[in-house]
Structures are given as C-alpha cells and as structure tokens.
C-alpha cells in the first residue's frame, strides 16, 4: 500500500514540540531533552510508518534534538557554572527554547487575529434570509481543537492495545482497501451511529494495513472538513463527528 499524505497541511516540527510540551506539562524554560527527543522521534517514526509525506524540516529538527542531547551528556567544566552553581552559561537548549517561545507567541497572535477576523465578518450587513446559513458556515470552519499530533498519539495507543490483545500465532492476510472507499465507509458508519462515534470504534479490524488505511481516511476527512475531531480534555477519549451533526 502506497499513500502519501502531506503532513504540512496540518502542522510543523515546532508545532510537534509545543504539542509535546503541552501534553506532558513540560516547563518550556527547562526542557528535558532526552525525554522530549524520545517522544519526538517516536512521533516521526509513526508518521513514516504511516507513509505520510514527512517534510525535511522534521528530520532537521530530529537531528538538532539529537545534537542537543549529546551536548547535554558531555561533562560540565567548572568555568561553565555560574556563581550560584545551578545554571550553565552555555546551555545547549537555549536557542531551541528561544525559537519555541517566539513561535508560541506568533501562534497566539495568529489565533487572536483570526478570531477578530471572524468577529468582523459577522458585523457585515446581510439580508436576514441569508444570515443563518452564513453563521452556520462560519461555525463549521472554526479551527479544530484536536491536532494531527493528538491523532498520532491516539493511533499509537490504539496500535499498542491491538498488539497486546492479538495472539502471537495469528496469521495475517493482506488486504488492500482504497482510501476513498474507507472514507465513504466512515461517513456511512457515522450516519448509522447518529453522527458521532468514538475514534477507537472505527478500528474494528485488527489487521495493520486496514488500520493504517482507516487512520489515513480519517486524516483526509479532517483535511476536507467532512468530519470534526473532539476531545474534551488532554488524554481523554477522542470522538469523531460529522459536520452535519456538529452544525
């Protein structure tokens, strides 16, 4: 099965790092490089396993993290230590930390500008007959709360769960399902379930190839704004809803 899905349509490497910092409640001013590098590489590995079209920037960031990690493992000399003995003048994490803080500010400003733009759009005078349909259209185009990386984390968890339950002697029969067919199946399944269903319940088949196609179909439906992904709190169960249900 070959299917290329461009990751850039969702996020970038700095977004992934910010996601990990938020998900694991990491202090951005004191990043545990070994831990976050392991998590970052795990996500990139999953994206490559899914045959997503991973941008070169992700690999550059991976190399940067490994370089910082190796520097952090080097012995510290006395002249590198400040008078209080707690911090180091030449912290290998400094540049990355500054980039993350700057990028986080940029994202916050971009979000605020988008919200203001949506507010201004609602102030335009339109005939009353068209106002309701316009409002619904604006609501369906709001940004998704769940990111690609939340979805990858859920898929990793799902794969671990399926692997743990699967008998070692199980013989796998390879099946190839067109992603377009799986997208149609998911939309029909949502319709039967009243427009909303648990993300995990979409994966009724234990075969890895089918699970991958299902996950890619969900991403494509997200990108096409045919479904909404909802998660109330961090680490909570993820639900998939059709736009008609959420409107």
Swiss-Prot record:
GO CC field: cytoplasm
Biological processes annotated in GO: cell division; chromosome segregation; DNA replication
Keywords per UniProt: Cell cycle, Cell division, Chromosome partition, Cytoplasm
Disulfide bridges in this chain: none
Location(s) in or outside the cell: Cytoplasm
Predominant subcellular localization, coarse grouping: cytoplasm
Matching InterPro entries: ScpA (IPR003768), ScpA-like_C (IPR023093)
Assembly and oligomerization: Component of a cohesin-like complex composed of ScpA, ScpB and the Smc homodimer, in which ScpA and ScpB bind to the head domain of Smc. The presence of the three proteins is required for the association of the complex with DNA.
Family: Belongs to the ScpA family.
Role of this protein: Participates in chromosomal partition during cell division. May act via the formation of a condensin-like complex containing Smc and ScpB that pull DNA away from mid-cell into both cell halves.
NCBIfam families found in the cross-reference section: PRK00104.1-1, PRK00104.1-4
Protein name: Segregation and condensation protein A
Gene name per UniProt: scpA
């Amino acid at each position: 099965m070959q299917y290329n899905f461009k990751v850039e349509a969702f996020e970038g490497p700095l977004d992934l790092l910010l996601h990990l910092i938020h998900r694991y409640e990491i202090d951005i001013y004191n990043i545990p490089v070994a831990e976050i590098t392991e998590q970052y590489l795990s996500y990139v590995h999953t994206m490559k396993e899914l045959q997503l079209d991973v941008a070169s920037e992700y690999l550059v960031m991976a190399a940067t993290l490994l370089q910082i990690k190796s520097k952090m493992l080097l012995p510290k000399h006395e002249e590198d230590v400040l008078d209080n003995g707690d911090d180091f003048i030449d912290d290998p994490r400094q540049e990355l930390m500054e980039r993350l803080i700057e990028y986080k500010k940029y994202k916050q400003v971009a979000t605020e500008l988008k919200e203001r733009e949506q507010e201004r759009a609602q102030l335009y005078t339109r005939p009353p007959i068209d106002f309701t349909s316009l409002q619904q259209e604006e609501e369906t185009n709001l940004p998704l709360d769940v990111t690609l990386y939340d979805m990858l984390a859920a898929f990793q968890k799902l794969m671990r769960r399926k692997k743990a339950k699967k008998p070692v002697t199980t013989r796998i029969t390879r099946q190839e399902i067109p992603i377009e067919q799986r997208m149609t199946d998911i939309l029909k399944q949502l319709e039967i379930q009243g427009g909303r269903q648990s993300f995990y319940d979409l994966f009724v088949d234990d075969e890895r190839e089918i699970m991958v196609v299902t996950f890619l179909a969900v991403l494509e439906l997200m990108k096409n704004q045919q479904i909404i992904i909802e998660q109330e709190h961090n680490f909570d169960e993820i639900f998939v809803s059709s736009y008609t249900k959420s409107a």
